[in-house]
UniProtKB/Swiss-Prot annotation:
It is found in: Cytoplasm, Cytoskeleton, Microtubule organizing center, Centrosome; Cytoplasm; Nucleus. This is Small ribosomal subunit protein eS7. GO terms for biological process: ribosomal small subunit biogenesis; rRNA processing; translation. Transmembrane segments: none annotated. One of its GO terms (cellular component) is small-subunit processome. GO terms for molecular function: structural constituent of ribosome. It comes from the Eukaryota. The gene is rps7. Its main location: cytoplasm. The lineage of its organism: Eukaryota, Metazoa, Chordata, Craniata, Vertebrata. Component of the small ribosomal subunit. Belongs to the eukaryotic ribosomal protein eS7 family. InterPro entries: Ribosomal_eS7, Ribosomal_eS7_CS. Keywords: Cytoplasm, Cytoskeleton, Nucleus, Ribonucleoprotein, Ribosomal protein. Component of the small ribosomal subunit. The ribosome is a large ribonucleoprotein complex responsible for the synthesis of proteins in the cell. Required for rRNA maturation.
């Protein structure tokens, strides 16, 4: 029998906490006795968090390594369904573990000789988190509303075709995104007018 830490690989050799071990154990059980065995065997996670998303609801965020994100997304719909059964209806979302590098300033520019890649910028990482969050639905547009006090509200338009699948999770998505990035976001399913 594998240990519970088999499915979780933390950076710098840190030990997973109790909650992460629970998630890891759940993934192991799924791997043992479901038809997802072949796909799950190669995959692991880097971290897991449980957060409050308004009205006393909780959501589970599972962080996965960026190179494995595509493989997770192939089985994500079924994986999420199974995990939500196990964790009594808490919404589960998968997000890739990305790093944001600080903006080079005049002082820090000399230290790192390499240019900061676009994928490590704050904007790119926040956009990518949004894409991961709403998978399997797609973002078809966004509007940013700047209020008079300078605060921003991002309106994200999702694909109408997926409305039935993700509509009940929209509040969770907003809560998770606010927690991870500090940005307010509202999801909509607009009718398209040409």
């Amino acid at each position: 029998m594998f240990s519970t830490s088999a499915k979780i690989v933390k950076p710098n050799g840190e030990k997973p906490d109790e909650f992460e071990s629970g998630i890891s154990q759940a993934l192991l059980e799924l791997e043992m006795n479901s038809d997802l065995k072949a796909q799950l065997r190669e995959l692991n996670i880097t971290a897991a968090k449980e957060i409050e998303v308004g009205a006393g609801r909780k959501a589970i965020i599972i962080f996965v390594p960026v190179p494995q994100l595509k493989s997770f997304q192939k089985i994500q719909v079924r994986l999420v369904r199974e995990l939500e059964k196990k964790f009594s209806g808490k919404h589960v979302v998968f997000i890739a573990q990305r790093r944001i590098l600080p903006k080079p300033t005049r002082k820090s520019r000399t230290k790192n000789k390499q240019k900061r890649p676009r994928s490590r910028t704050l904007t790119a990482v926040h956009d990518a988190i949004l894409e991961d969050l709403v998978y399997p639905s797609e973002i078809v547009g966004r509007r940013i509303r700047v209020k008079l006090d300078g605060s921003r509200l991002i309106k994200v338009h999702l694909d109408k075709a997926q409305q039935n699948n993700v509509e009940h999770k929209v509040e969770t998505f907003s809560g998770v995104y606010k927690k991870l990035t500090g940005k307010d976001v509202v999801f909509e399913f607009p009718e398209f007018q040409l």
